[in-house]
């Protein structure tokens, strides 16, 4: 479904004013991660802070996200509940579990995200370090296409 159409459907059903939302897809394996969101397994995500543009703001609690599948179609809307920065080395078991991936363990999270972040940093000739800041975002699913 088109993102704007999904947003308008959600707004009308929930009496929401305004258009305070972001549109994005997960960077690695978007359809699998989207499925985890839609089933309630995934309630958090993370990104590498150094990859943000200097004028790019972090998400804020209360903002909405329209999440796209790999074909660019909108499939669900989440509402951000919490955003914080932490070092890669300080990611917690609780955050790894909320990300809902693999066996939900911290070791799985670190392995898969170290690989993914290193791929993102290839063009900069960098590798992730334990001190690199990670943007951790928690959210709740508020609307989905069946």
Where are these regions (language model features)?
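Mixed-charge, low-complexity intrinsically disordered regions
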Residues: 1-77, 83-146
């Amino acid at each position: 479904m088109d993102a704007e159409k999904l947003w308008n459907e959600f707004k009308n059903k929930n009496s929401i004013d305004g258009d305070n939302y972001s549109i994005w897809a997960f960077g690695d394996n978007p359809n699998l991660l989207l499925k985890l969101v839609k089933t309630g397994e995934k309630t958090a995500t993370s990104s590498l802070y150094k990859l943000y543009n200097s004028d790019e703001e972090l998400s804020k609690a209360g903002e909405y996200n329209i999440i796209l599948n790999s074909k660019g179609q909108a499939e669900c809307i989440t509402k951000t509940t919490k955003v914080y920065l932490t070092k890669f080395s300080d990611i917690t078991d609780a955050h790894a579990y909320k990300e809902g991936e693999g066996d939900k363990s911290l070791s799985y999270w670190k392995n898969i995200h170290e690989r993914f972040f290193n791929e993102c940093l290839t063009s900069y000739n960098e590798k992730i370090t334990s001190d690199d800041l990670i943007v951790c975002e928690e959210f709740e699913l508020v609307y989905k296409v069946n």
